[in-house]
Design a protein with these regions (language model features):
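Phosphate-binding/switch region of NTP-binding enzymes
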Residues: 38, 102-214
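Conserved ATPase-coupling elements of RecA-like P-loop NTPase cores
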Residues: 92-99
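Conserved Walker B
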Residues: 88
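Hydrophobic "anchor" residues on beta-strands that sit immediately upstream
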Residues: 82
Length: 224
């Protein structure tokens, strides 16, 4: 991560895997030792069952060269095959005249690195200011900060749809937009976001959502 520390990432991972509220796992007034221990045991059980490990950089990274060196190290020493970068816009490069040039360089070099190492990389990205401000409009891959460089160097682009975000208590219904897919078609995936444990899970679309996509439904068929 180029943004969060190890403890922040650890508590978020524990919340997602256990389903417990993240506020009960982080140090603060809502912290609960019993919840923390239960979440830790669940994460340990998953690790023992799967044999997998989540490795996080020990010190903050900012330079692209340090990011590349970190990925190479984890691949060569620990055999890592799946890498998540949080997030692209924080990677710093010298001699870049604009944010577009910087993101283009970062995206190109990370793409070349993943090809040479044979690994999968998930790169998190921000939207640009125009897309972030247009909360009622459906986002597109072209709205990622830095222009089309991120889209061009990606096999798939998944977007969190803020235009169809409906909050209900500590959860919200929205959609993941598969806006680019070199391996097949594009699709909108209905999901539920849980603010307490940070989980995103699939859900069934409501009748109203189905009608918006496919036309009005009746008992005997569909009306256009």
């Amino acid at each position: 991560s180029l943004e969060m520390g190890r403890s922040e990432l650890a508590t978020r991972l524990m919340a997602i895997t256990s389903g417990f509220p993240v506020v009960e796992l982080e140090q603060g007034p809502s912290f609960k030792q019993d919840t923390f221990e239960r979440a830790r045991r669940q994460l340990d059980a998953i690790r023992e069952l799967s044999g997998g490990h989540v490795l996080v950089n020990r010190r903050p990274l900012s330079k692209l060269s340090d990011l590349i060196a970190c990925i190479k190290y984890y691949h060569e020493v620990h055999g890592s095959k799946y890498v998540v970068v949080d997030y692209l816009q924080l990677a710093w490069t010298a001699n870049s005249q604009s944010i577009h040039d910087r993101i283009e360089l970062v995206a190109h070099q990370l793409r070349d690195l993943t090809h040479s190492l044979g690994i999968t990389l998930v790169a998190l990205s921000q939207f640009n200011r125009q897309t972030s401000a247009a909360r009622s409009e459906r986002p597109t891959a072209q709205g990622l900060m830095g222009g089309s460089a991120v889209e061009n160097d990606s096999h798939q682009v998944l977007l969190f749809d803020h235009s169809r975000f409906t909050r209900m208590g500590h959860t919200a219904d929205t959609w993941l937009i598969l806006d680019k897919n070199r391996h097949g078609g594009v699709v909108d995936i209905p999901v539920k976001w849980d603010f307490q444990n940070l989980r995103i899970s699939p859900r069934s679309p409501t009748i109203e959502e189905q009608e918006q996509q496919h036309g009005r439904l009746t008992r005997v068929g569909r009306m256009r």
